[in-house]
Amino acid sequence: ISKYQLWEWTQGVGLYGLYNYYKLTGDRGTFDFLCGWYDARMAEGLPERNVNTTCPMLTLLCVYEDTQDERYGALCRDWAEWVMHGLIRTGDGAFQHMITGDANDSQMLIDTLFMTVLFLAKAGVVFGRKDYVEEAKRQCLVHIKYLYDTSCGLYFHGYDFKGRHNYGRVHWARGNSWYTCGIMELIGLIPIEPGLRQYFLDTFRAQVDALCACQAGDGMWHTILDDPASYKESSATAAFAYGMLKGVR
């Protein structure tokens, strides 16, 4: 149980799922749990700020919208300013994928889109900061530029600006899933001009076509998408299903 009391990306993803469950069902117990979780973590003291510890901020911002509790609002404003002006940048101004205990010098990872960019985008809408919204869109474009594999429609996990390479050029399932569900979330969070919206949708559809081509017979996806000898991975499969369903809707 103790690991669920940590402030990290894994908890952040789960919290966002719980918040969306609350919005769907109106279950007040779920919302009260979320408020209690944030109150307890804030009382304990928050961890260092990085890409992954930004993930829980997305749901906190949602909770702030519903409660207008300025304890939450003040933290969200301050953290969003840190993302915009304090988070380390690497090549082309991309957010460096700095995480707890590792700065990941000069490295870009696709995970950042879900972990950090979604929060910045929503903060731009909630706080009326157009610069946040524009930066969120730009970060998506830069990540697509370096991580999208035009030969097949899938994504590489990362890019090293020092070595100028995509590591082993591996199409990792969970990494790809951050784009599948993340880009659908982004489109729902912020206003996007028609041309850019179409571009995001086109890259999404190209990825989905590629994913369908490498889906296993039982509906799962392998952890290396185009390597059927690699094990099947449930978290990526769930994220792909989520993103695809949201795309259809």
Residue ranges, per PLM feature:
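Glycan-recognition and catalytic cores of secretory/periplasmic carbohydrate-active enzymes
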Residues: 1-249
